[in-house]
């Protein structure tokens, strides 16, 4: 019975909620955005808005570019030329795609120059490099994590450590992956990435943008000062988070008797927005671009608006080896790691961070 009971239990999920103000010296909003590296979807919702301003629309269209490179040898990411051209000049993120974190070998390059490898046991042993067991591989360690600091490595390319890693990637266990890459930089031509990897199959991409107007949207009433809500006066943060997910899924919020797909209804109390603008950006989006978008949404209330709040939601790649900073990320049954800002018209904000079963508590 105990085993059956465990099988019936839903996997553990965590939702952390906090509130602050963008003007506070100790506000964490910038640090949190900057350390959530691998983002594949960015969505924002603006109640009582039928048309985006030109400035906001232009910003949405400038969320790229990013690149895909097929069958890129891993040793290309540790060369002196690559580190000097990209890692040291700006902020570079890279992530393997078409790989599953719980089944395949996966690799991520973080903007701080850390190269993270999540490898199955056989591959790990064949590389001959030192790492540590994955936190989520069970009692028998079947997956291992290797972390390589490229900035430190580049200080001495004649070191024994560099020669060993280079030998491992080039000769002992050559590994090739399909990569997504995105690079935030200043003062360098955009074509640098294309020309550098010209001998491989490289393509430039722009994120896909979907704009829609939601009519007669039931919206929860919120009080910026109260995450817990107030009976009959305001909804709490968890109720709002559930509601927002339903809106993104285009679920019916009325709980009508004939609806067999969704029995969800908007929490009470609520108001009806005549129209709301929903924008979704999908691709490989850098934290720097997200931070600019967040700042622009804060300025949305510089002039009086009917909307009491707007939201910005960011979802990470389910198969990234890390979630926030260098914290290991696993898939289990969902692989979700995401955060949401509720931006109020007085510059207060709620920050909601959610992760699945194979993750540490969000920062």
From Swiss-Prot:
Chain segments annotated as coiled-coil in the UniProt record: none
InterPro entries: RNase_P_Rpp40
Disulfide cysteine pairs (residue numbers): none
Keywords of the record: Nucleus, rRNA processing, tRNA processing
Location(s), subcellular: Nucleus, Nucleolus
Main location: nucleus
Molecular functions per Gene Ontology: ribonuclease P activity; ribonuclease P RNA binding
Keyword Cytoplasm tagged: no
Classification via Pfam families: Ribonuc_P_40 (PF08584)
GO biological process: endonucleolytic cleavage in ITS1 to separate SSU-rRNA from 5.8S rRNA and LSU-rRNA from tricistronic rRNA transcript (SSU-rRNA, 5.8S rRNA, LSU-rRNA); tRNA 5'-leader removal
Free-text function comment from the UniProt entry: Component of ribonuclease P, a ribonucleoprotein complex that generates mature tRNA molecules by cleaving their 5'-ends. Also a component of the MRP ribonuclease complex, which cleaves pre-rRNA sequences.
Binding partners and assembly: Component of nuclear RNase P and RNase MRP ribonucleoproteins. RNase P consists of a catalytic RNA moiety and about 10 protein subunits; POP1, POP4, POP5, POP7, RPP14, RPP21, RPP25, RPP30, RPP38 and RPP40. Within the RNase P complex, POP1, POP7 and RPP25 form the 'finger' subcomplex, POP5, RPP14, RPP40 and homodimeric RPP30 form the 'palm' subcomplex, and RPP21, POP4 and RPP38 form the 'wrist' subcomplex. All subunits of the RNase P complex interact with the catalytic RNA. Several subunits of RNase P are also part of the RNase MRP complex.
Name of the protein: Ribonuclease P protein subunit p40
């Amino acid at each position: 019975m105990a085993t059956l009971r465990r099988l019936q239990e839903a996997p553990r999920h965590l939702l952390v909620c906090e509130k602050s103000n963008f003007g506070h010296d100790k506000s964490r909003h910038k640090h949190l955005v900057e350390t959530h590296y691998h983002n594949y979807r960015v969505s924002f919702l603006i109640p009582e808005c039928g048309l985006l301003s030109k400035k906001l629309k232009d910003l949405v269209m400038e969320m790229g570019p990013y690149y895909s490179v097929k069958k890129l040898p891993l040793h290309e990411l540790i060369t002196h030329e690559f580190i000097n051209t990209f890692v040291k000049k700006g902020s570079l993120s890279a992530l393997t795609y078409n790989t599953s974190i719980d089944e395949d070998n996966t690799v991520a390059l973080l903007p701080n120059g850390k190269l993270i490898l999540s490898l199955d046991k056989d591959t790990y042993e064949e590389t001959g490099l030192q790492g540590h067991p994955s936190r989520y591989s069970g009692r028998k360690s079947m997956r291992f994590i290797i972390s390589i600091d490229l900035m430190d490595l580049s200080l001495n390319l004649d070191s024994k450590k560099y020669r060993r890693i280079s030998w491992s990637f080039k000769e002992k266990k050559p590994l090739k992956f399909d990569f997504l890459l995105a690079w935030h930089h200043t003062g360098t031509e955009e074509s640098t990435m294309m020309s550098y990897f010209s001998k491989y199959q490289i393509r430039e991409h722009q994120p896909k943008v979907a704009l829609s107007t939601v009519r007669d949207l039931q919206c929860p009433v919120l009080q910026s000062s109260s995450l817990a809500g107030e009976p009959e006066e305001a909804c709490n943060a968890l109720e709002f988070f559930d509601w927002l997910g339903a809106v993104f899924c285009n679920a019916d919020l009325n709980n009508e008797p004939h609806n067999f797909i969704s029995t969800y209804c908007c929490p009470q109390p609520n108001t009806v927005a005549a129209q709301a603008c929903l924008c979704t950006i999908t691709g490989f989006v850098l934290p720097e671009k997200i931070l600019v978008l967040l700042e622009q949404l804060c300025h949305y209330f510089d002039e009086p608006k009917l909307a009491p709040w707007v939201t910005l939601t960011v979802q990470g790649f389910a198969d990234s080896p890390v979630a926030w900073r260098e914290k290991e990320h696993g898939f289990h049954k969902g692989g979700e790691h995401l955060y949401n800002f509720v931006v109020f018209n007085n510059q207060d904000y709620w920050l909601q961070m959610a992760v699945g079963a194979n993750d540490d508590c969000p920062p």
